Structure formats: structure tokens, C-alpha cells
Curated annotation (Swiss-Prot):
UniProt GO MF annotations: manganese ion binding; RNA binding; RNA-DNA hybrid ribonuclease activity
Gene name in the database record: rnhB
Catalyses which reaction(s): Endonucleolytic cleavage to 5'-phosphomonoester
This protein's name: Ribonuclease HII
Annotated residues for binding of a divalent metal cation: D7, E8, D99
Intracellular or extracellular location(s): Cytoplasm
Similarity-based family: Belongs to the RNase HII family.
Residue stretches spanning the membrane: none
Organism: Francisella tularensis subsp. novicida (strain U112)
Domain RNase H type-2 intervals: 1-185
Length: 185
């Protein structure tokens, strides 16, 4: 059975997109060290990212913008991203396994698995792709807006991030539907 693993990164931050990734692994090309991206060092994630995009049978990465998150809400934006991931890889898999407890409204043979990123290697691989991709976006945001410190906090609502928003203002990349941002508008 060919499994498509899907996971997301970036539901909690105040800025940037939510990112979903899907991975179909090549059973003949074992990638050692796959685990939940949050349990890996940045260096290990980067190394595994390169191995995954090189050796996976198929993969895709989808971004949903802060503006779309504001229009839909974060749950619906995440489900939309996951749906788009599955559609991008349609007819290449037999079953979809998604990290978490919610599935998009779709007709695919699928299952939501709580802590799936720690249990299913395809979901672990998707977790790594989503996290590294999103972190790279945050590094680009840091280059564009160095005073905000995106390289450090990755958009999460840290004390430093909130103080920098108060000091320098709300950017287009901030999620205006999120309460901490609304309070600063």
C-alpha cells in the first residue's frame, strides 16, 4: 500500500503562512533518522530535508498566506492546505495519513493519527519538509525586516516579537485575525 503522509507547520505563529507538506516515500530508499521535526535539531532537519526531496517517490509543499488565514481561520486554512497537498499528488497513493485529529472534507481513503509525526515515517518526513520550508520563509522575513527578529522567534508570539510589533508596527505578513495582532492595530 502506498502511503501519503501529510503534516503542517505554522499554526501558532502571528506571522507568515501555514505550510502543509505531503510525502510518498520510496520503499527501496530508506532515510534514516526520520522523526517528528520538533524533536530534531535544525541541522538534522536540514540534512533530512535534502534527503527527503532527493529520495522521496513524490512530495509537495503548499503555503496558505496570512491573508487567506485571516479570511478562513487557521483551522480551515490548514485543512485547505492539506486538501491541496493530496490533490497535488492525486492518483499516486492508496491511503492518506494525516498528523492530528482532523481530516479535510475529501473522498480519499484516509486516517488522522494523533502524534502521527512520531509514529508514521511518511508523516515524519512531511513534518520535516513543512517545518524547514516555513523556517526558510521566516529567514527571508528576517532579511526583509531585520528589526523584528524573525530568524529567532519564527513568528511565534514571544515577548520580543510582541515588543517589536509595538515598536515597529504590524506588517502585511502578520495575521490580523489573531488576537495579539488585533490588540496592536
Amino acid at each position: 500500500m502506498i502511503i501519503l503522509g501529510i503534516d503542517e507547520a505554522g499554526r501558532g505563529p502571528l506571522s507568515g503562512p501555514v505550510v502543509a507538506a505531503g510525502v510518498i516515500l520510496d520503499q527501496d530508499k530508506i532515510i534514516d533518522g526520520l522523526a517528528d521535526s520538533k524533536k530534531l535539531t535544525e541541522k538534522k532537519r536540514q540534512s533530512l530535508y535534502q534527503q527527503i526531496i532527493t529520495h522521496a517517490k513524490a512530495y509537495t509543499i503548499v503555503e496558505i498566506s496570512p491573508q487567506q488565514i485571516d479570511e478562513l481561520n487557521i483551522l480551515q486554512a490548514t485543512l485547505k492546505a492539506m486538501h491541496q497537498v493530496a490533490n497535488n499528488l492525486e492518483r499516486q497513493f492508496d491511503k492518506v495519513l494525516v498528523d492530528g485529529n482532523k481530516l479535510p472534507n475529501w473522498d480519499y481513503n484516509s486516517e488522522a493519527i494523533v502524534k502521527g509525526d512520531s509514529k508514521i515515517i511518511e508523516i515524519s518526513a512531511a513534518s520535516i519538509l513543512a517545518k524547514v520550508h516555513r523556517d526558510n520563509i521566516c529567514l527571508e522575513h528576517d532579511r526583509l525586516y531585520p528589526q523584528y527578529g524573525f530568524a529567532k522567534h519564527k513568528g511565534y508570539p514571544t515577548k520580543e516579537h510582541l515588543e517589536n510589533i509595538k515598536k515597529y508596527g504590524v506588517l502585511d505578513i502578520h495575521r490580523k485575525s489573531y488576537k495579539p495582532i488585533q490588540l496592536l492595530l
